[in-house]
């Protein structure tokens, strides 16, 4: 099982799906300054709680600043049992431009 890197256009279909959990792995200040609606800001401080309470069968869309760190985070989520994990190419920067 592995994650898939997807474009913003592909991600938009997931954003409309109620079974999608959106994870923002940027720092909390960047998250506060702007984020994808309905996203959850995940850090080392709350990752354990997120793993405990989140169903492994959801669609998990992970994003960061420009799409690099989200790949490592996506792999981490796969290793922790999530079945359908996506990393947003271009990250929040791409989302904010469009």
Predicted regions and their residues:
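Rhodanese-like catalytic fold shared by cysteine-dependent sulfurtransferases
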Residues: 1-20, 27-59, 65-98
């Amino acid at each position: 099982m592995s994650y898939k890197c997807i474009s913003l256009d592909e991600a938009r279909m997931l954003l409309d799906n109620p079974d999608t959990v959106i994870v923002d792995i940027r720092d909390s200040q960047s998250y506060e300054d702007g984020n994808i609606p309905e996203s959850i800001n995940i850090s080392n401080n709350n990752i354990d709680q997120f793993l405990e309470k989140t169903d492994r069968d959801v669609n998990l869309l992970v994003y960061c600043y420009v799409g690099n760190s989200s790949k490592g985070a996506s792999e981490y989520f796969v290793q922790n049992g999530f079945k359908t994990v996506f990393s947003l190419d271009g990250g929040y920067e791409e989302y904010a431009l469009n």
